[in-house]
Amino acid sequence: MKPLKLFCIGLLLCPLVCLLLETAPPPSALLTLEVKEKTGLKSDAMGVFAIRKNTSDINRQVSGLQRPWMTKFKNHLSDFFKSSIPPAAIFALFVTTAIMRAAIVNKRLEEPHRQWTIDQRSSLEMQNMNLIKLFGG
C-alpha cells in the first residue's frame, strides 16, 4: 500500500479507537459495592447518593411532562448523542478529516498533469477527430 493510504487508514482508526475506549461498559454496581466494602467505605453513603439521584430523575421527569413533545424529542436525541459519543471521538474525527483533506489536496498539487497520447484517447474522441478531418477542419 502507498504511504498516503496507510496514513489515511491510521487517521480514520483514531476516532474509532477513542469511541471504543470511552464507551466501554462501566463495572457493574454489584462489583463497585464489593470494592467499596473491601476498601472500608460505608455502604450508607452510596444509598444516600442513590436516593438523591432518584429524586433528581423524578424532578426531571415531572418537569418534562409540561414541555411540548418536540422539545422532549430533541432533548432525548441530544442526551443520547452526548452519552453515546465521547467528545474526544468527535474532535478526532474533525482533525482526521482536515488532515486527510490537506493530504489529498497536497497530493494533487504534486502530481504533474498527464499528457494523453493518441492511443489513449477514447473512441468517441477519435471519431470526432476523423469527422474534423473529413470536413476540412
UniProtKB/Swiss-Prot annotation:
One of its GO terms (cellular component) is plasma membrane. Residues 24-84 are extracellular. The chain crosses the membrane at residues 85-105. Coiled coil: none annotated. It comes from the Eukaryota. Residues 1-23 form the signal peptide. This is Small integral membrane protein 9.
